[in-house]
Amino acid sequence: MSRTGKKPISLPEKVDVKFEGLSITVKGPKGELQRTLPNGVSLSKDENFIFVKPINEKRQSREMHGLCRSLVANMVEGVSNGFTKKLEIVGVGSRAQVKGKTLVVSAGYSHPVEVVPPEGITFKVENNTNVIVTGPDKELVGNEAAKIRAIRPPEPYKGKGIKYQGELIIRKAGKSGKT
Protein backbone atom coordinates (compact mmCIF):
# COMPACT_ATOMS: atom_id res chain seq x y z
CA MET A 1 0.00 0.00 0.00
CA SER A 2 1.27 3.45 -0.92
CA ARG A 3 2.53 5.59 1.93
CA THR A 4 1.38 8.71 0.12
CA GLY A 5 -2.00 7.16 -0.67
CA LYS A 6 -2.71 6.27 2.97
CA LYS A 7 -2.77 9.92 4.05
CA PRO A 8 -6.25 11.49 4.17
CA ILE A 9 -6.82 14.72 2.25
CA SER A 10 -8.20 17.46 4.49
CA LEU A 11 -10.80 19.76 2.96
CA PRO A 12 -10.50 23.45 3.87
CA GLU A 13 -13.60 25.56 4.35
CA LYS A 14 -15.20 26.91 1.16
CA VAL A 15 -14.07 23.85 -0.84
CA ASP A 16 -16.81 21.60 -2.19
CA VAL A 17 -16.08 18.13 -3.59
CA LYS A 18 -18.40 15.95 -5.67
CA PHE A 19 -17.56 12.61 -7.20
CA GLU A 20 -19.42 10.10 -9.35
CA GLY A 21 -17.50 6.91 -9.85
CA LEU A 22 -14.02 7.98 -10.97
CA SER A 23 -14.97 11.53 -12.01
CA ILE A 24 -14.23 14.17 -9.36
CA THR A 25 -15.15 17.86 -9.33
CA VAL A 26 -13.61 20.28 -6.83
CA LYS A 27 -14.98 23.84 -6.41
CA GLY A 28 -13.36 26.58 -4.37
CA PRO A 29 -12.63 30.31 -4.23
CA LYS A 30 -9.96 30.12 -6.98
CA GLY A 31 -12.07 28.18 -9.47
CA GLU A 32 -13.37 24.74 -10.36
CA LEU A 33 -11.40 21.68 -11.47
CA GLN A 34 -12.70 18.42 -12.91
CA ARG A 35 -10.74 15.23 -13.56
CA THR A 36 -11.40 11.59 -14.32
CA LEU A 37 -9.17 9.32 -12.25
CA PRO A 38 -7.72 6.07 -13.62
CA ASN A 39 -9.26 2.69 -12.77
CA GLY A 40 -8.15 0.85 -9.67
CA VAL A 41 -9.07 3.31 -6.90
CA SER A 42 -12.17 4.33 -5.00
CA LEU A 43 -12.95 7.65 -3.34
CA SER A 44 -14.83 8.22 -0.10
CA LYS A 45 -15.64 11.34 1.89
CA ASP A 46 -15.96 11.56 5.67
CA GLU A 47 -16.75 14.99 7.14
CA ASN A 48 -13.74 17.18 6.15
CA PHE A 49 -11.55 14.42 4.72
CA ILE A 50 -11.29 12.54 1.43
CA PHE A 51 -9.87 9.03 1.40
CA VAL A 52 -8.40 7.32 -1.67
CA LYS A 53 -8.28 3.53 -1.47
CA PRO A 54 -7.21 0.83 -3.93
CA ILE A 55 -10.13 -1.39 -4.94
CA ASN A 56 -7.99 -4.54 -4.76
CA GLU A 57 -4.39 -5.62 -4.23
CA LYS A 58 -3.50 -5.97 -7.91
CA ARG A 59 -0.38 -4.22 -9.11
CA GLN A 60 -2.20 -1.57 -11.17
CA SER A 61 -4.41 -0.57 -8.22
CA ARG A 62 -1.40 -0.23 -5.95
CA GLU A 63 0.43 1.84 -8.60
CA MET A 64 -2.49 4.25 -9.03
CA HIS A 65 -3.18 4.64 -5.30
CA GLY A 66 -0.53 7.27 -4.47
CA LEU A 67 -0.88 8.99 -7.85
CA CYS A 68 -4.63 9.51 -7.46
CA ARG A 69 -4.25 10.76 -3.90
CA SER A 70 -1.67 13.33 -5.08
CA LEU A 71 -3.86 14.42 -8.01
CA VAL A 72 -6.87 14.99 -5.73
CA ALA A 73 -4.74 16.77 -3.10
CA ASN A 74 -3.35 19.09 -5.81
CA MET A 75 -6.88 19.85 -7.00
CA VAL A 76 -7.97 20.77 -3.46
CA GLU A 77 -4.84 22.90 -2.92
CA GLY A 78 -5.30 24.61 -6.30
CA VAL A 79 -8.91 25.71 -5.81
CA SER A 80 -8.21 26.96 -2.29
CA ASN A 81 -4.77 28.64 -2.65
CA GLY A 82 -3.75 28.35 -6.31
CA PHE A 83 -0.30 27.64 -7.74
CA THR A 84 2.38 30.00 -9.05
CA LYS A 85 5.57 29.60 -11.06
CA LYS A 86 8.04 32.45 -11.39
CA LEU A 87 10.41 32.90 -14.31
CA GLU A 88 13.30 35.33 -14.83
CA ILE A 89 14.41 36.70 -18.19
CA VAL A 90 18.18 37.26 -18.30
CA GLY A 91 19.91 39.12 -21.12
CA VAL A 92 20.30 42.57 -22.63
CA GLY A 93 17.17 43.66 -24.48
CA SER A 94 15.14 40.64 -23.38
CA ARG A 95 11.86 41.53 -21.75
CA ALA A 96 8.22 40.57 -21.39
CA GLN A 97 4.94 42.43 -21.21
CA VAL A 98 1.27 41.57 -20.96
CA LYS A 99 -1.11 42.83 -23.67
CA GLY A 100 -4.66 41.99 -22.65
CA LYS A 101 -4.27 38.41 -21.46
CA THR A 102 -1.48 37.55 -23.91
CA LEU A 103 2.16 37.47 -22.81
CA VAL A 104 4.54 39.06 -25.35
CA VAL A 105 8.18 38.01 -24.93
CA SER A 106 11.09 39.75 -26.69
CA ALA A 107 13.89 37.22 -26.33
CA GLY A 108 16.41 38.14 -29.01
CA TYR A 109 14.51 36.89 -32.04
CA SER A 110 13.59 39.07 -35.02
CA HIS A 111 9.99 39.01 -33.82
CA PRO A 112 8.27 39.07 -30.42
CA VAL A 113 6.83 35.73 -29.29
CA GLU A 114 3.22 35.74 -28.09
CA VAL A 115 1.94 33.22 -25.54
CA VAL A 116 -1.85 32.93 -25.20
CA PRO A 117 -2.87 31.49 -21.81
CA PRO A 118 -5.39 28.65 -21.58
CA GLU A 119 -8.55 29.20 -19.56
CA GLY A 120 -7.84 29.70 -15.85
CA ILE A 121 -4.17 30.72 -16.26
CA THR A 122 -3.02 34.32 -15.79
CA PHE A 123 0.30 35.99 -16.54
CA LYS A 124 1.78 38.87 -14.56
CA VAL A 125 5.03 40.73 -15.36
CA GLU A 126 7.17 42.62 -12.85
CA ASN A 127 10.10 44.86 -13.88
CA ASN A 128 9.86 43.65 -17.52
CA THR A 129 12.02 40.63 -16.62
CA ASN A 130 10.03 38.61 -14.07
CA VAL A 131 7.05 36.58 -15.29
CA ILE A 132 4.57 35.05 -12.83
CA VAL A 133 2.25 32.27 -14.03
CA THR A 134 -0.73 31.60 -11.73
CA GLY A 135 -3.76 29.33 -11.79
CA PRO A 136 -5.64 26.63 -9.89
CA ASP A 137 -4.39 23.65 -11.96
CA LYS A 138 -0.84 22.66 -10.98
CA GLU A 139 -0.24 20.69 -14.17
CA LEU A 140 -1.41 23.52 -16.43
CA VAL A 141 0.65 26.14 -14.56
CA GLY A 142 3.77 23.99 -14.89
CA ASN A 143 3.14 23.33 -18.59
CA GLU A 144 2.67 27.03 -19.39
CA ALA A 145 5.81 27.95 -17.44
CA ALA A 146 7.72 25.28 -19.38
CA LYS A 147 6.41 26.67 -22.69
CA ILE A 148 7.61 30.16 -21.75
CA ARG A 149 11.02 28.81 -20.68
CA ALA A 150 11.28 26.88 -23.97
CA ILE A 151 11.11 30.16 -25.95
CA ARG A 152 14.76 30.84 -25.01
CA PRO A 153 16.22 28.26 -22.58
CA PRO A 154 19.22 29.50 -20.58
CA GLU A 155 22.55 28.89 -22.26
CA PRO A 156 25.54 27.65 -20.22
CA TYR A 157 28.17 30.23 -21.26
CA LYS A 158 26.68 33.57 -20.23
CA GLY A 159 23.48 32.35 -18.57
CA LYS A 160 21.23 34.34 -20.92
CA GLY A 161 17.70 33.11 -21.53
CA ILE A 162 14.51 32.41 -19.59
CA LYS A 163 14.90 30.40 -16.39
CA TYR A 164 12.81 29.49 -13.38
CA GLN A 165 13.38 31.68 -10.34
CA GLY A 166 16.00 30.00 -8.20
CA GLU A 167 17.08 27.62 -11.00
CA LEU A 168 20.81 26.99 -10.99
CA ILE A 169 22.40 27.22 -14.42
CA ILE A 170 25.62 25.23 -14.59
CA ARG A 171 28.14 27.47 -16.33
CA LYS A 172 30.85 26.32 -18.71
CA ALA A 173 34.22 27.90 -19.32
CA GLY A 174 34.60 29.54 -22.71
CA LYS A 175 37.29 28.74 -25.23
CA SER A 176 40.76 28.89 -23.78
CA GLY A 177 43.13 31.02 -25.83
CA LYS A 178 46.59 30.03 -27.05
CA THR A 179 49.29 30.31 -24.42
From Swiss-Prot:
Gene3D superfamilies: Ribosomal protein L6, alpha-beta domain
Complex formation: Part of the 50S ribosomal subunit.
PANTHER family (alphabetical): 60S/50S RIBOSOMAL PROTEIN L6/L9, LARGE RIBOSOMAL SUBUNIT PROTEIN UL6M
Pfam families membership: Ribosomal_L6
Annotated Gene Ontology cellular component terms: cytosolic large ribosomal subunit
UniProt entry keywords in alphabetical sequence: Ribonucleoprotein, Ribosomal protein, RNA-binding, rRNA-binding
Keyword RNA-binding set for record: yes
InterPro entries per UniProt: Ribosomal_uL6-like, Ribosomal_uL6-like_a/b-dom_sf, Ribosomal_uL6_a/b-dom, Ribosomal_uL6_bac-type, Ribosomal_uL6_CS
BP GO annotations: cytoplasmic translation
Tagged with keyword Transferase: no
Record's function text: This protein binds to the 23S rRNA, and is important in its secondary structure. It is located near the subunit interface in the base of the L7/L12 stalk, and near the tRNA binding site of the peptidyltransferase center.
A GO term, aspect molecular function: rRNA binding
Protein name per its UniProtKB record: Large ribosomal subunit protein uL6
Family: Belongs to the universal ribosomal protein uL6 family.
